[in-house]
Swiss-Prot record:
It comes from Burkholderia pseudomallei (strain K96243). This is Histidine--tRNA ligase. Belongs to the class-II aminoacyl-tRNA synthetase family. One of its GO terms (molecular function) is ATP binding. Its main location: cytoplasm. Its EC number is 6.1.1.21. Pfam families: HGTP_anticodon, tRNA-synt_His.
Length: 446
């Protein structure tokens, strides 16, 4: 292959890492604005951590025998200093690391939220990507079931704000460490009785992470799993009181839930409450949000013993649901598209476009694609395609007379007439456009 041909080859993105194109950006912005407004209403503060962390953060935090650490992390050795680094597969461990490093809990509990890309090396499919986005909350320093209930109810409010339906809540308790240890012994004994029927994945986990066997999706193992010892039967008084307290709060707020004794989550840092929000509208990838309590994690990562809970949700999956339920908002166009013909008109158009932006209007100023001036007809086609509400037109006559022509592209003009082009003095343009937009909005409300 020649060098010239190599240069002409079309490059594509990495499989499972998707571009967010302009036609989709409006949906992302709608979701982000909705979730940010919700999180502010609950008193949460934004935190932003690097996408690259020391690998040890995740092996210590998530657990060395979890699927994420064993098979799914993008890890590499920094050629400059030999450090083992990893693209973050999740963000709870990183937020906790930041809270410890910057002594954020010295003056009491913190409510934090994040939004950003995560990375996992797995087979791309619908709702599961190698680069994906999560929004999450971390309530650090809160020990009671009231914090668990609040973050769960926060999710329900988000579904309501987005207009989503059919997302169901499942909850469970993983108890405390000594209760999980007692259950682990009995679970291994039980699974050993069926070892010849376990698939390779279950056999691999039998002695390293047997709790995860309960989460298998293999149809052939469902009866074995259904009859396995349940962790909820091993809960002591403290764990049971915490779980009962959570249920009472959810019931008091009329939030329906199902207790799923097989719900265990795939990260080692969880204890007590775990929960998932699930839907049947996304095929196999039915979990749209998940979380729980992770009281041991802060101490495990070098901080003082501190209670904590949180959740994370997959943004792409929620956007899929919005599309499925036809809840995608219409893309808003700009307010004004400025059309001009001739050098003098172009100079005047630049000045006026900036003045309009100074007043808060969104303005596109026509710029030539090939360096030559486009015809009025061509520019007006672009103005209409842009979604702008009005075209502001500068020609030789307008420049000579100190006026502009304003043409409504959607709705009505200032005088209530549809698509009627009017001549307006330049000094009155801003007032005219604002009045025209008010008239258009009122026309749309009728």
């Amino acid at each position: 292959m020649t060098e010239q041909k190599r240069k002409l080859e079309k490059l594509t993105g990495v499989k499972g890492m998707n571009d967010i194109l302009p036609q989709d950006a409006g949906l992302w912005e709608f979701f982000e604005a909705t979730v940010k407004s919700l999180l502010r209403a609950y008193g949460y503060q934004n935190i932003r951590t690097p996408i690259v962390e020391h690998t040890q953060l995740f092996t210590r935090g998530i657990g060395e025998v979890t699927d994420i650490v064993e098979k799914e992390m993008y890890s590499f050795v920094d050629a400059l200093n030999g450090e083992n680094l990893t693209l973050r597969p999740e963000n709870t461990a990183a937020v906790v690391r930041a809270a410890i490093e910057h002594n954020m809990l010295y003056d009491g509990p913190k409510r934090l939220w994040y939004l950003g890309p995560m990375f996992r090396h797995e087979r791309p499919q619908r709702g599961r990507y190698r680069q994906f986005h999560q929004v999450g909350v971390e309530a650090l320093g809160f020990a009671g079931p009231d914090a668990d209930a609040e973050i769960i109810m926060m999710c329900q409010r988000l579904w309501d704000d987005l207009g989503l339906t059919g997302i169901k809540l499942e909850i469970n308790s993983l108890g405390l460490a000594e209760e999980r240890a007692a259950h682990r012994v009995e679970l291994i004994k039980y699974l050993e009785q069926h070892v010849d029927k376990l698939d390779d994945d279950a056999q691999r986990r039998l002695y390293t992470n047997p709790l995860r066997v309960l989460d298998t999706k293999n149809p052939a193992l469902q009866e074995i799993v259904r009859n396995a010892p349940q962790l909820i039967d091993f809960l002591g008084d403290v764990s049971r009181a915490h779980f009962d307290g959570l249920q009472r709060l959810l019931k008091a707020n009329n939030l329906p839930f199902t207790i799923n004794p097989r719900l265990v989550r795939g990260l080692d840092y969880y204890n007590l409450t775990v929960f998932e929000w699930v839907t049947d509208k996304l095929g196999a990838q039915g979990t749209v949000a998940a979380g729980g309590r992770y009281d041991p994690l802060i101490e495990q990562l070098g901080g003082k013993p501190t209670a904590a809970c949180g959740w994370a949700m997959g943004v792409e999956r929620i956007l899929e649901l919005l599309k499925e339920e036809h809840l995608v908002p219409e893309q808003e166009g700009v307010d004004v598209y400025v059309v001009h013909q001739g050098d003098a008109a172009r100079e005047q158009a630049f000045i006026v476009a900036e003045r309009l932006r100074d007043t808060g209007l969104d303005v596109i100023l026509h710029c030539s694609a090939d360096g030559a001036g486009a015809s009025f007809k061509s520019q007006m086609k672009r103005a209409d395609a842009s979604g702008a509400a009005f075209a502001v037109i500068f020609g030789e006559d307008e420049v000579a007379n100190g006026t502009v022509s304003v043409k409504p592209l959607r709705g009505t003009g200032a005088e209530g007439e549809k698509n009627v082009q009017q001549s307006v003095p330049v000094e009155s343009l801003t007032e005219f456009l604002i009045n025209a937009m008010v008239a258009t909005a009122e026309d749309g409300d009728d």
